[in-house]
Amino acid sequence: MSKLKELIEKFCPNGVEYQKLDDILDYEQPTQYIVKSTEYDDSYNTPVLTAGQTFILGYTNEEDGIYKADKDSPTIIFDDFTTSFHWVDFDFKVKSSAMKMLRPKSTFEGSFKYVFYAMECIHFEAVNHTRHWISKYSQFEIPLPHPEVQEEIVKILDRFAEYAAELQAELQARQEQYEYYRDKLLTFNEIGGGYSRCNMDENE
């Protein structure tokens, strides 16, 4: 944090400017990337994504119309109706046209990942069932400090995101361990070579 403070004092002595997302990001419609068949199988290679909570709906073996993304050229998938979004750095197809793929404009000189994190700070509740990116969401402004400040913020937040993912994985593993032993301990016919059921007589 001390390095971040130094960078802010160096590059942002008078505060930071704000820019609209519309001035930072371009969007692409998903039409050509929509999956044709919903017969998914985990043995297939290409994930089918939704920008909602489920994220990965399944995997397809379709080879055409795959959206190309990787670590060096990621994208943000944005649900045009709910305004939920995800960071994606792998190839994929999509389930429906209810999303947009966002990438930085060629003129943007900052950190795309910083923009993603800044978007997570936008508090907007989608009430009406209508598309929101063009009419509303893209008009929100985010702070844009010097690129070096952006990069340092991303490093810090990436580190915390990694910690959170590790904790979540640990919690999931502990939950599965708990359920295993709970079921094992409460299945008495598997303990001590079996058991006999006893009927209780209230008069005894």
Regions found by a protein language model. Give the residues of each.
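Charged, alpha-helix-forming regions
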Residues: 1-204
